[in-house]
């Protein structure tokens, strides 16, 4: 939004662009995010910067469903992405990393066309560690799943990226009560 408010004055825009890029880097390093991308229209100065700013066309790298793209609503879109590679300048690793993405796609209210988007990429291992530390009893399993049933974080890191069975996914997502017992297992679900 800050960039859009400065686009009529090229000198001010360049200054604001650098401030936003520095802020993104600060957030990334302060909070230990894997990476942060901001997606701009092709006509916007900086849309092809390639490190922190990409074209809106590049937003497709996250393989989001048509429904998520057509009606993003006011909520963030969470998903699990495999093999995301950072630009070589930021990481010289030959292989990509699996990440949890938190995306927002903002559309023009009149035209319904995307105006800009951003994605915060998170390390699933950090979430898994937090879940493991939540309970001392190792018989308690905690996990975060995406809408499609992909395990984004789990008390057992090895399960990150695997997919719940349709039966288990349905059990967790379609119950009206958040605390229930089934087959001698106790469940407490929290949905967005």
Model-derived features with residue positions:
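Extracellular/periplasmic ligand-binding regions of membrane signal-transduction receptors
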Residues: 1-18, 37-46, 50-51
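Solvent-exposed, extracytoplasmic
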Residues: 17-28, 115-159
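Extracytoplasmic/periplasmic ligand-binding sensor regions of membrane-associated signaling proteins
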Residues: 29-30, 42-121
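Short, hydrophobic-rich beta-strand element in sensory/regulatory alpha-beta domains
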Residues: 33-38, 140-143
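Amphipathic coiled-coil signal-relay and dimerization helices
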Residues: 42-52, 149-155, 189
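A short local loop/turn or secondary-structure capping micro-motif enriched for an aromatic residue
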Residues: 54-58, 125-126, 159-163
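Extracellular/periplasmic juxtamembrane segments that couple receptor/chemosensory ectodomains to their
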Residues: 136, 147-148, 157-192
